[in-house]
Amino acid sequence: MQKIVLLGLAGALGSLARYGLAGLVQRAAPGSFPLGTFIVNVLGCLAFGFVWGVCENRISLHPDLRVVLLTGFMGAFTTFSTFTFESLGLMETGQWLAFALYAGGQLLLGLALLWLGLGTGRLV
């Protein structure tokens, strides 16, 4: 139960961090390009990689705390960091077809389903 509560709190903090940082960046650089989201996503990748790398090579972080940080905070901050981490795993193990299907499939299917959802939602 404690892990679930910590996961929820970390998720709330990640959401607030995403909202705050994306808004700050977008106000600093107004325009049609979603720079706030772009910055959040790439910084999320950096942070996810850093935490994973530190846990892998430097410190022994309790598995529950790793879940709270990576799934809770980073999952709410950006799911793009998880997507790129899993993509890199496929690339590093030479699973190029799986990587292409995973990365390309999410982008293309995601865009198609977003378009379908928008169209359906506009009809309701």
Curated annotation (Swiss-Prot):
Subcellular location: Cell inner membrane
Domain of life: Bacteria
Catalytic activity: fluoride(in) = fluoride(out)
Primary subcellular site in the record, as a coarse category: membrane
Membrane topology: Multi-pass membrane protein
Protein family (similarity comment): Belongs to the fluoride channel Fluc/FEX (TC 1.A.43) family.
Cited PANTHER family: FLUORIDE EXPORT PROTEIN 1-RELATED, FLUORIDE-SPECIFIC ION CHANNEL FLUC
Role noted for this protein: Fluoride-specific ion channel. Important for reducing fluoride concentration in the cell, thus reducing its toxicity.
Name of the protein in its database record: Fluoride-specific ion channel FluC
Species: Nitratidesulfovibrio vulgaris (strain DSM 19637 / Miyazaki F) (Desulfovibrio vulgaris)
